[in-house]
Curated annotation (Swiss-Prot):
Cellular component, GO, one term: vacuolar proton-transporting V-type ATPase, V0 domain
Keyword Cell inner membrane: no
Record Gene3D superfamilies: lithium bound rotor ring of v- atpase (1.20.120.610)
Species assigned in the record: Schizosaccharomyces pombe (strain 972 / ATCC 24843)
Gene encoding the protein: vma16
Name this protein carries in UniProt: Probable V-type proton ATPase 20 kDa proteolipid subunit
Length: 199
């Protein structure tokens, strides 16, 4: 078993054991997930969403550039003509990070200074949760998009090294893969548009 699998199963089993212990010893009310959601500041949820959007998007772009760049370098050893033409795949990977930054800027415009006395309202919770889940959605879409564009860019570089006529055909597939990040951008704008500013 891998380290990730072992830690996941250990955490799950320990959570079940602690939950059952609390349930059978009449202290189940102290494990209240709803109070955790309501006691945490809406600012925290909003800022976590913005941070995760940027983090996942940049990880996806970096991962895609790594996958694509290694294939371009490897293929350019045998066919040096591919190195400049296939840089468009690197640019597609960088666009993924730009999508995340655009959403982060749009979401951060909703974060304002307010009076802490009347802060925990339904509107503020909705805005915080909307920014959180919108950021998670956009970030994960861009993570998947970056990997997708990197893999198709790698295939385009290796196909171009073998046969130059295949480059345009594989580039069309790469463009369709980059649309995944655009879908995430649109979903983020829709979710963020429903949320009101913190005021």
């Amino acid at each position: 078993m891998s380290l990730f699998s072992t830690s996941l199963w250990t955490t799950t089993v320990m959570s079940i054991i602690v939950g059952l212990y609390m349930l059978f010893h009449n202290s189940g009310e102290s494990f209240d997930f709803g109070s955790f959601l309501l006691d945490t500041s809406p600012y925290t949820w909003g800022l976590l969403g913005i941070a995760s959007c940027v983090a996942f998007g940049i990880i996806g772009a970096a991962w895609g550039i790594f996958i694509c760049g290694t294939s371009i370098l490897g293929g350019a050893v045998k066919a040096p003509r591919i190195k400049t033409k296939n840089l468009i795949s690197i640019i597609f990977c960088e666009v993924v990070a730009i999508y995340s930054l655009i959403i982060a800027i749009v979401f951060s415009a909703k974060i304002n200074d307010i009076n802490p006395a009347g802060f925990y309202t339904k509107s503020h919770y909705y805005t915080g949760f909307a920014l959180f889940w919108g950021g998670i959605t956009v970030g994960l879409c861009n993570l998947i998009c970056g990997v997708c564009v990197g893999i198709t860019g790698s295939s385009a570089a290796l196909a171009d090294a073998q046969d130059a006529s295949l480059f345009v055909k594989v580039l069309v597939v790469e463009i369709f893969g980059s649309v995944l990040g655009l879908f995430g951008l649109i979903v983020g704008l829709l979710i963020g548009g429903k949320a009101s500013d913190f005021s």
